[in-house]
């Protein structure tokens, strides 16, 4: 679970984001794909927050991550705070 990385840092998942991933039947591998292959969201987010969108067919998937310090692992990591799917996103 903690072997998936983005920009060299591991990705941890918040409880709510884990529920969203399970609901959509997706894994951290899918999150990494969105972060690496997706495009920046047109929304403004707080400094240090990254939101990426990826179009797949008629659906657009989005992932929101923030950089944080993981107390158990004793290292910086990304925390997935939101994962979602919607229709009618920007066509890039």
Please report, for each region that a protein language model flagged, where it lies by residue.
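Ribonuclease/tRNase effector modules and their secretory precursors
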Residues: 1-92
């Amino acid at each position: 679970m903690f072997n998936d990385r983005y920009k060299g840092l591991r990705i941890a998942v918040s409880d709510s984001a884990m529920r969203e991933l399970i609901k959509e039947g997706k894994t951290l591998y899918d999150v990494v794909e969105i972060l690496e292959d997706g495009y920046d969201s047109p929304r403004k987010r707080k400094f240090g927050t990254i939101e990426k969108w990826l179009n797949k067919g008629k659906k657009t998937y989005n992932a929101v991550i923030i950089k944080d310090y993981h107390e158990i692992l004793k290292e910086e990591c990304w925390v997935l705070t939101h994962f979602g799917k919607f229709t009618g996103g920007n066509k890039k």
